[in-house]
Regions:
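Acidic/aromatic-lined carbohydrate-recognition and catalytic surfaces
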Residues: 1-11, 17
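Loop/turn elements at helix/coil->beta-strand transitions in domains of secreted/extracellular proteins
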Residues: 2-3, 67-69, 106-110
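Loop/helix patches that line or flank the sugar-binding groove of alpha-linked glycan CAZymes
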Residues: 8-9, 25, 31, 35, ...
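A short acidic (Asp/Glu
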Residues: 14-17, 122-124
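Short, solvent-exposed loop/turn segments at the edges of secondary structure
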Residues: 21-23, 67, 127
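Glycoside hydrolase catalytic-domain groove-lining segments
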Residues: 42-66
């Protein structure tokens, strides 16, 4: 059996829940529009802060449960979707990189549906739970209706059908990152070491290693 739990609070508080023996806790410190990933991508925090926090949180969690498995995520059904965190000409690149920073964390990573497309959805909860954007035609086969009180809004990026045909799309970028993760199990299972001498405001360096 595997159990992952949610405690939407500060990192020091949810870290203590590992003492209960639970396998995983959702890692809220890196998630949402005010989390570490979005702050780095928006220039509100240094790139170094991402790597430093990856290294630091290992000891924070292990002190309560040496066998913990981190549960990173970027957004969920209660948060605005990450494509809405970024504006301007670099927003697509930021959306891609933000997904990569989540997907390359260690542990068991969670990806909320539609993040791989850069779907929009913010404000009231119904908007955050918009139906999967399979096709730009809302009446196409397989398309679902959104929650009854969802606002009528346009997506920022193309549908899955369109992105599948574009090698440079967010969807295909995310697929490539997941492929790299799956081909290198040490990414999920290894220990992170932050390399200060190679890191700074705009870039970071780290290693991920295990006994092999």
């Amino acid at each position: 059996n595997y159990l992952v739990c949610e405690c939407w609070t500060d990192q020091n508080t949810y870290a203590k829940y590992y003492e209960s023996g639970v396998d995983s806790m959702f890692d809220f410190a890196f998630a949402d529009k005010s989390g570490i990933i979005a702050n780095v991508m928006n220039g509100k925090a240094s790139a170094t802060s991402y790597a430093k926090n990856l290294e630091t949180e290992q000891g924070m969690y292990a002190q309560y449960n040496p066998d913990y498995i981190n549960a990173p995520f970027y957004t969920n059904h209660d948060m605005g979707r990450s494509a809405g965190y970024y504006a301007g000409e670099n927003s697509e690149a930021q959306t891609k990189m933000g997904n990569a920073l989540n997907l390359l964390m260690n542990g068991n990573v969670f990806l909320y549906y539609g993040e791989e497309l850069g779907m929009k959805g913010s404000g009231k909860d119904e908007n955050k739970r918009a139906p999967m954007y399979w096709n730009k035609d809302g009446n196409a086969e397989g398309m679902c209706k959104g929650p009854a009180d969802m606002d009528d809004f346009r997506m920022k990026f193309d549908s899955l059908e369109e992105q599948q045909e574009d090698p440079d799309s967010i969807y295909n970028y995310v697929k490539q990152v997941i492929r790299v993760r799956n081909q290198n199990p040490v990414i999920a299972r290894g220990t992170t070491a932050y390399l200060e001498q190679y890191s700074g405001e705009q870039c970071f360096a780290l290693t991920r290693s295990d006994e092999n």
